C-alpha cells in the first residue's frame, strides 16, 4: 500500500466484537499454535508494550477475519507458508509503503506508523498469490494467470472477483488516480480486488455488529471527496472522482463476488 493518498483514517477506532482472548494478553506460543504462520518477526523498535499490543490486536483481527470467511484460524497461514512481520522489513523514506506483502518471501509486513489497518488488504494479496503459486503459474490469481489443476469452482470464484471489480465504477476512479503516477497501481486487477476485499470484510463485520480497524481501516468516501476538492482548489483544475474503494452502491456486487 504506497502512500499516494490518505486512504485510511489517521487513527484506528477501538475494536468491537467477541472477546477472542478471554480478556488476557495472547502469548507468542498461543499465537503460533492458533494460526500456524511460518514465522512471526518483530523489528527492533517493536519492544515491550508495543510488541504485546501488536500481538493482541493482530490476534483479534485474524480471528475476526477467519469468522468473516468461515474458515478455521489456521487456514489464514495458507498451509503454514505465510510469514508475518511487524516493522521488521520496511525500507522507510518518503512514500514508503505503510504495509506490504512480499511474494518472493511470502511475508506480510505491517510497518510501525500505519501498518495496522492494512492487514485484510495484505492478507488478500497473500491469498491471491498463494493460489497462483500453488497451481504453477506464479503471480496473482486475480491478474488472470492460468491456474492449471485448480478446482473449477475455485477458478470460477477468482474470475468472478476479477470480473466484478473490473465492472465497478471504482475502476474509473482508480484510473483517475493513476494519472498522477508514472505507472498503473490503483487500476490494476490485483489492487482493485484487494480494496474490494477490504470493503467486503468491513461490511461483513458490520453485519455482525462488529468492527476492527486493525484489520481494515478505510477513509469515509465523503471525507475523501472533501479532501480531493481541497486538493484540486490548491493545485488548480477540476476535482475528479477518485475514491479508491467501492462506494455503498457498489457493495452488493462486491458481496456477491466474495460470498459465492
Which role does the model predict for each range below?
Residues 2-56, 71-260:
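Active-site-flanking segments in enzyme catalytic domains
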Residues 62:
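Extended, Lys/Arg-enriched charged tracts that mediate electrostatic binding to polyanionic substrates
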Residues 65:
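Divalent metal-coordination and catalytic microenvironments
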Amino acid at each position: 500500500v504506497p502512500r499516494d493518498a490518505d486512504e485510511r483514517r489517521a487513527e484506528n477506532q477501538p475494536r468491537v466484537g467477541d472477546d477472542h482472548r478471554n480478556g488476557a494478553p495472547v502469548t507468542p506460543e498461543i499465537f503460533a499454535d492458533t494460526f500456524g504462520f511460518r514465522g512471526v518477526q518483530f523489528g527492533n523498535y517493536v519492544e515491550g508494550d508495543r510488541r504485546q499490543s501488536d500481538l493482541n490486536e493482530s490476534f483479534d483481527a485474524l480471528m475476526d477475519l477467519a469468522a468473516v470467511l468461515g474458515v478455521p484460524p489456521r487456514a489464514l497461514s495458507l498451509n503454514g507458508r505465510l510469514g508475518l512481520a511487524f516493522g521488521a522489513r520496511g525500507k522507510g523514506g518518503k512514500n514508503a509503503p505503510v504495509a506490504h506483502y512480499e511474494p518472493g518471501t511470502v511475508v506480510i509486513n505491517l510497518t510501525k506508523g500505519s501498518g495496522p489497518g492494512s492487514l485484510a488488504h495484505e492478507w488478500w494479496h497473500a491469498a491471491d498469490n498463494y493460489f497462483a503459486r500453488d497451481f504453477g503459474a506464479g503471480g496473482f490469481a486475480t491478474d488472470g494467470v492460468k491456474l492449471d489443476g485448480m478446482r473449477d469452482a475455485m477458478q470460477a470464484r477468482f474470475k468472478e472477483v476479477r470480473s466484478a471489480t473490473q465492472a465497478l465504477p471504482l475502476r474509473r476512479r482508480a484510473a483517475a488516480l493513476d494519472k498522477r503516477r508514472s505507472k498503473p497501481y490503483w487500476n490494476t486487477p490485483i489492487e482493485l480486488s484487494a480494496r474490494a476485499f477490504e470493503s467486503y470484510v468491513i461490511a461483513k463485520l458490520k453485519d455482525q455488529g462488529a468492527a476492527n480497524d486493525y484489520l481494515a481501516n478505510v477513509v469515509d468516501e465523503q471525507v475523501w471527496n472533501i479532501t480531493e476538492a481541497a486538493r484540486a482548489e490548491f493545485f488548480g483544475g477540476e476535482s475528479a472522482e477518485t475514491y479508491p474503494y467501492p462506494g455503498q452502491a457498489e457493495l452488493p456486487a462486491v458481496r456477491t463476488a466474495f460470498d459465492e
